[in-house]
């Protein structure tokens, strides 16, 4: 038998083996729908999630979560396509990270005019407001997000963990897990440590099961 015949025979055997073994079958075409989570996406508790600022390629993924509320901690305003997506899916965006004419018009109910540097860390008042939204199960399923899903989101989730009774070492470890190669910010960790968790107003009739 020639080398050519041997090669053809071997090829036929390989095809037969592939047909009989599902693990060897090649995918003929890519999936029709690409499901891509936002940067640094991670579940926090049941129906509570965290991530970086979502983009258009993440919308199919977000649809699967059936979100009711997005807690927006990013210092910049959302893109128009994201606002349209949220409106089409009846998702309420709560603006906590930015306080300006845009956010006041949308959701931020306040009678005060506040000037905020977009590069500043969150202050105690904004953390308190964020946590009071999180501890209300009527807002669920809920996504907490900021620009990269690191420091602002990490601050709020860190204070939430303290509210849950976590020790500071565990809180710090979780925060740094999302900060990447640059590591955590000492000012963020100090803010988490010093935050007055007793200032958070919790309605016992609306508290999530994992906090009871």
From Swiss-Prot:
Reaction(s) this enzyme catalyzes, per UniProt: O-phospho-L-tyrosyl-[protein] + H2O = L-tyrosyl-[protein] + phosphate
PROSITE patterns: TYR_PHOSPHATASE_DUAL
GO terms classed as biological process: cellular response to oxidative stress
Main subcellular location of this protein, as a coarse class: cytoplasm
Keyword terms: Cytoplasm, Hydrolase, Protein phosphatase, Stress response
Cell compartment(s), UniProt: Cytoplasm
UniProt source species: Scheffersomyces stipitis (strain ATCC 58785 / CBS 6054 / NBRC 10063 / NRRL Y-11545)
UniProt feature, compositional bias: Basic and acidic residues: 12-22
Ranges where the Tyrosine-protein phosphatase domain occurs: 40-208
Function recorded in the entry: Putative tyrosine-protein phosphatase required for protection against superoxide stress.
Active site per database record: 146 (phosphocysteine intermediate)
Family assignment from sequence similarity: Belongs to the protein-tyrosine phosphatase family.
Region (Disordered): 1-27
GO cellular component entries: cytoplasm
Enzyme Commission identifier(s): 3.1.3.48
Any one GO molecular function term: protein tyrosine phosphatase activity
Recorded superkingdom: Eukaryota
Protein name: Putative tyrosine-protein phosphatase OCA1
């Amino acid at each position: 038998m020639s080398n050519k015949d041997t090669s053809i025979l071997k090829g036929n055997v390989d095809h037969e083996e592939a047909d009989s073994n599902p693990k060897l079958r090649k995918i003929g075409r890519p999936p029709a729908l690409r499901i891509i989570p936002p940067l640094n996406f991670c579940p926090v508790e049941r129906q509570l999630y965290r991530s970086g600022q979502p983009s258009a390629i993440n919308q199919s993924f977000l649809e699967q979560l059936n979100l009711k509320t997005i807690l927006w901690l990013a210092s910049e305003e959302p893109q128009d396509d994201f606002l349209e997506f949220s409106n089409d899916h009846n998702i309420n965006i709560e603006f906590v990270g930015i306080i300006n004419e845009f956010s006041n018009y949308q959701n931020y109910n306040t009678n005060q005019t506040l000037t905020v540097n977009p590069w500043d860390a969150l202050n105690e008042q904004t953390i308190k407001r964020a946590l009071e939204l999180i501890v209300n199960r009527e807002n669920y399923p809920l996504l907490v997000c900021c620009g990269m899903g690191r420091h602002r989101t990490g601050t709020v989730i860190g204070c939430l963990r303290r509210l849950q009774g976590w020790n500071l070492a565990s809180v710090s470890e979780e925060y740094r897990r999302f900060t990447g190669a640059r590591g955590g910010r000492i000012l963020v960790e100090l803010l988490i440590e010093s935050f007055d968790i007793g200032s958070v107003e919790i309605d016992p009739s609306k508290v999530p099961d994992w906090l009871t």
